[in-house]
Amino acid sequence: MRTTKSKKPITVASVCVAAVACAVGAYRFVYLPLRPADVSHARISINATGKFDESQIDGAVKADLAGLKSWNGCRVDAVRYDAKRSATLLAAEHDVTASGGSSSISTAIDEYGMDNVIYLSNDISCRAGSQNSSQDGWGSWYAWNPGSARAEHGWIFIDEGY
């Protein structure tokens, strides 16, 4: 009479390995891409000249980080405010549209005044599946209007992009 060895240990081990593989895959390809952006480790760099006070700039950074949380599966590495760069970019945007074009930023400058619009630069890292991507220098524009119902930390979101 022949006896056969039990295949139960191999089956149990196979099921355990498959379960772990499924859990790792779900974490990496389902959970990570769907979670709000991690803003907890963002480096904040401020180079201000007095246009906005410290609490206004802090409010702009908080509003920006809150908005960037919608970048699911990403990490915000840095938020920068440089008053000179902000003024230069805002003036250039307004000058370009002066000859008949339009943009949300130029419209905000007309509506709120050049002295009430701010530009923040962001570095963002994202992971899509097995690929990493980086958005360095992603811009966010806000208008200071603390009385508005749309304002977050006193700032109204205007636009974002390069």
PLM regions: where:
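Short beta-strand edge/turn micro-motifs at domain boundaries
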Residues: 135-162
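Flexible low-complexity loop/turn motifs enriched in small/helix-breaking residues
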Residues: 2, 8-15, 22-134
